[in-house]
Amino acid sequence: MAFSGVAQAAAAKDNGAKADAASVPTAYEVSILYADRTWIWKDGAAYFGKNGRSLRAWTSREGAASVGQGKWIATRDGKMCMDLAWRSKAYTGQQNRTCYSHRIKGGNIEQRKDPDGEWYSFKRSPEDPADEYRKFEPGDTKAAQFEESSKLIDSKN
């Protein structure tokens, strides 16, 4: 994968730093992780568009589908933020921002949900079966499910 060397390159930037020190990936490095990929969740998925940084997501819990549409950004302080407005048959929500921070530590990428989530392994070098990043698929692999959920929500019945 093209990104596998980014963690190592970033670790090399801090040549004189302690082995335990963490560095922050650039906005470009963070964007490589997400652009044109689908993040598979237990009960849905989110697609991070490449051009214009569009974002769409869907969930289906206990027979109740929800879809979210908006944008995503990568920041220079190592964050990926999702600005999504969720809707279902029962509600139409306001746009909300959810951010995840990233850091590179020991050649591995860690992630946490902001503002105060626990750091966990996101992408290790070499890859590990427990990595969260293994839930990402190249391309828009769940577009059909998103469209199906949208039609269900928008139907009058």
Which residues make up each language-model segment?
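Bacterial N-terminal signal peptides
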Residues: 1-4
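Lipid interaction determinants
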Residues: 7-69, 75-157
